[in-house]
Amino acid sequence: MAAGVDRPFRPQRYELFGLERQLFGMGHDAWVGAFGYPKPESWQKVYRERYGKEPQSRPDPRHAVDFIIEEVRKHPGELTIAEIGPCSNLALAVLKAPDIVPLIKRVIFMGGSFFKPGNVTPTAEFNWWFDPEAARIVVRTPFREQIMVGLDVCEKMPFSSDRYQAFLAGQRPEMKKLLESTYAGQQFAKDKAFSQYVWDVLAAAILIDPSLITEECTCAVDVNAEFGPSYGQALAYPDNGPQGSQKARIVMTIDQERFWNMLTAR
């Protein structure tokens, strides 16, 4: 793990986030990520508070942007990048070292909501809304292949209490304790009707086995980076997109049975 960018591209967005909410409102999901917390004093303090003990290892000393650049150059044509958060680090990497773009085998995004409403705002999905300028840079980069795992597929697959219990079964005591301490674990313990989507896990599964995809469409994609009510919205153009946009595979459906079996396999 390497520490990376701690601010979105737009200047002072963190400081002015409260005003942004007043102006544009929010969606059905109240999660706002790092915008909802003060900046931590150190990663060591966060670790101690979260796990109640001293860290047993340290992050990679390289900045995440340099880590991406160096590893791609070291393994040309071999690496698939799983972009399962805001796109800030990857955006800076391709701006700093554009030579890595043709060396990346594939980029799989957990991000965007192309044909349905957003979650954190009525139009935008969280990861791309958090740093729309970075997301726009990355999706407009001419990678060999881009696969979009957005809300279009993720919100078809709720993680229910039954699936959670199946996932817990057979876990080592340490892992079980960790899972039960998470927000989802606490909610499942209180409410058997609770469910949650597994956005990032789904993107990781497709990275491991792209044949999970059973329905998709290929479109030119873009991100609205104009500051306003639709800031961060994912845009899909079945025919001709705006100049600079790139074609991407947008996942619509996957083999759910295979996915859930993959998640609980030992």
Predicted regions and their residues:
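Intrinsically disordered, low-complexity, compositionally biased regions/tails
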Residues: 29-31, 37-40, 56, 232, ...
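Active-site rim/loop-helix segments in enzyme catalytic domains that contact anionic ligands
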Residues: 1-36
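Short, surface-exposed, polar/charged, turn-prone segments marking secondary-structure boundaries
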Residues: 28-32, 109-111, 134-137, 174-179
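A residue-level signal for conserved active-site and pocket-lining positions in enzyme catalytic cores
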Residues: 1, 138, 204
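Conformational coupling and interaction surfaces
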Residues: 129-133, 145-266
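Active-site histidine-anchored catalytic micro-motif
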Residues: 7-14, 37-156, 161
